Amino acid sequence: MNRQGSARSHLTLALCTILHGFTHAYGSMLVPLYFRIADDLKLSGVGAATLIVTLYGAVYNLASYAAGLAADRFSRKTLLAIGLLGNAAAILAIGLSRQYSHILMLGVAAGLFGTIFHPSANALASSHYPKAPGMAIGILGIGSGLGFFFGPQIAGWRAATASWQLWNVAQWQKPCVEMALAGLVVGIIFLFLGTDASGAPTRRRGAKIDPALNRRVMRMASVLMFRDFAGVAGLSLAAIYVRNVFNLHVSQAGLFVGIMMLPSVIFNPLAVYLTPKRRRLPGLTMILIIGGLLAGTAPLWPLAGALIILCAFQTMQLASYAVSDAATLERISPEFRGRVVGLFLEIAGTFGALGPWVMGAWADHLHNSHTRFNYFGPFALISACMILAAASPPLIARLGPVLSAIKPMEEISPETMGVVP
């Protein structure tokens, strides 16, 4: 194994993980700020504030197949850098705009750049580690936990404590400005230090994908979309729930939402490692069912108990992404991975993106939004969606056999983590 190539691959995977963190931080940072956004912009309710995140997520996923086509043809490293730089620029503009309509349009722009990440990053990470694509995806998944943790936490903290003044920037906008500037710096660093897999051309004609494979991916996505809805909806519902029921301050709500996501930093790669080969799909079924059962009990608990339950739910929820992504990409030839990820997200992710708006509108129409037992309905919906998604493993299996079998205790050994020669 070429040591220089190995170092480049390790660095690229580490940087992709950081980019993953920024991508999800930008997508979740407004969640604890819903009430401040609604008050500052004089909106009709929290549902109008959630529409910003809903539009971001909808565009992020609707354009995923086009992003997948690009990932299978052009330099994935360059695409990832462009994606983060554009996403950060749009978030910066959100932090400077005072018009709700402009902010909605900027949410769309941020989603268009954000959509580049998953098709390109999943394909790039797995192509750097062809002997252990599952573990590469598991490590990449650490970034989602970091982003979902730091995004809401930093947003809530800085919205409460930032003291700098610039034009008419509101308190809730200050974390947007700060995190956008950080993303611009990281995007430039990645552009110069990230690498495509050795020997991969920077521009290539995409191999023609089998229409039957597309149909199998669409069937899989039509079931896993309920998992995606549960995760995105659960994040927004948690922020609304703790603000209304437990009267948490914006910084406390941000910390609550962030802590919910933190264990996935460890559990995502661990879940992939503990479910190799034939364990992968049964493990996914178990993760989805446990997560669904946990979510339905959230309104039964006081604040501390709700934190534990929702933390466990989101750990299962995010782990299901790492495991299902690994199970899928292990069955897909490298030249098709960008398009497969893009097609999946276009269906499952777009449906999931409706979650924030559905939860915000539901909360606005509750008879008494400050009583925790009135939230049984929304949490039951999330629970049911997770359990429905547990029907997905047989559909993943129909994608085909695992292309490169890795023994359980070898998946993260130096030999199997070898890079493309």
Model-derived regions, located:
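Helix-loop-helix hairpin linking two adjacent transmembrane segments in secondary transporters
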Residues: 139-195
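Extracytoplasmic gate region of multi-pass secondary transporters
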Residues: 30-31, 216-265
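Residue-level signature of mid-helix packing/kink "hotspots" within the transmembrane helices
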Residues: 28, 57-65, 148-149, 261-269, ...
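Cytoplasmic helix-loop-helix junction between adjacent transmembrane helices
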Residues: 106-144
